[in-house]
Amino acid sequence: MSLQFGPEYVRAIAPYVTGKPISEVAREFGLEAARIVKLASNENPLGMPASARVAMTAAIDGLARYPDANGFSLKAALHAKFGVPEAWITLGNGSNDILELAARALVAPGQGVIYAQHAFAVYALAAQEVGARAVEVPARDYGHDLDAMAAAITPDTRLIYVANPNNPTGTFLPADAVAAFLAKVPPTVVVVLDEAYNEFLKPEQQYDSIAWVRRYPNLLVSRTFSKAYGLAGLRVGYGIAQPQLTALLNRIRQPFNVNSLAQAAAVAALSDTEFLRRSAELNAAGYAQLTQAFARLGLEYVPSSGNFVLVRVGDDADAGARVNLALLRQGVIVRPVGNYGLPQWLRISIGLPEENAACIAALESALAQAEAAA
């Protein structure tokens, strides 16, 4: 009889599946890596800010030393940007780290964690890894049904994840809807407001979530430098909450969870408003390029407030996987989302104009092949 290690709720976890890296697709399909277009992981097609590269170069000589465990310089920069005390800030190895720290710090086995259907897969994983009672609330129009999520709260609920904008669907919750929801949540239940794609919001969509943090001791706002700031490979994110919450998160986080290069780059990127402006401008143009093509091809898509678009590529349960494979063979990497309960859909990150054009051409070819085979 084989040994079984660990609790059953850990053994039951299905590992998180990342977007395929370029090197893997090149090996698998015999393609030239330089010709592969990756639009799978919602990365910034502009790359990293030049200011971040300069900051990292200056920090290289210090790599024999451990990083600043408290992240003084980065917390000071975040304090200057948001006006919150440094004690309200927790640094993470990407915002994934913050999302998981919240579950580990706040939820005991058997207690409830609420999240929406079609929301970021890490919410369910974070709940599973602590043995929580995971409650997936059915989506409304591919996004969060906040009324239903509030109604799902029970006396043993300890944590609620809300993404705004949502990944992988791109849906957006207006400020008044989020404010009304926060007012309904009992003070014993912590809300994690995941704003990984906040920097892509249009001016008319923007709201002040930090004002909510000042009002609600049970609110944790998480953000990342992986998306708009172009630092995905460095893994740096942060959470902002009142000190009762951050003290708990900091008790269980790894002491050196954000490396020296990441801290230096994030400080530089945070003040690079011109890079953010260019990123948002490129994203808006790319969104128009992709969605106009989808409309021309007769494809349904979900209006997105992020740097990606969810598009329906067929009606049968194998449509997403089939079209995804056809795209891979042409050297285009996108994200199938069958694991999100959306097997007919693909999530396509917004890239450079030429990358978007290559994706559109490959998608048109893949759809034509599927139609011919039908």
Swiss-Prot record:
Broad class of enzyme this protein falls into: transferase
Catalyzed chemical reaction(s): L-histidinol phosphate + 2-oxoglutarate = 3-(imidazol-4-yl)-2-oxopropyl phosphate + L-glutamate
Modification type N6-(pyridoxal phosphate)lysine: residues: 227
Keywords: Amino-acid biosynthesis, Aminotransferase, Histidine biosynthesis, Pyridoxal phosphate, Transferase
Enzyme nomenclature, EC number: 2.6.1.9
UniProt pathway annotation: Amino-acid biosynthesis; L-histidine biosynthesis; L-histidine from 5-phospho-alpha-D-ribose 1-diphosphate: step 7/9
UniProt-listed InterPro entries: Aminotrans_II_pyridoxalP_BS, Aminotransferase_I/II_large, HisP_aminotrans, HistidinolP_aminotransfase, PyrdxlP-dep_Trfase, PyrdxlP-dep_Trfase_major, PyrdxlP-dep_Trfase_small
Superkingdom to which the source organism belongs: Bacteria
Essential cofactor(s): pyridoxal 5'-phosphate
GO molecular function, one term: pyridoxal phosphate binding
Subunit structure: Homodimer.
Protein name: Histidinol-phosphate aminotransferase 2
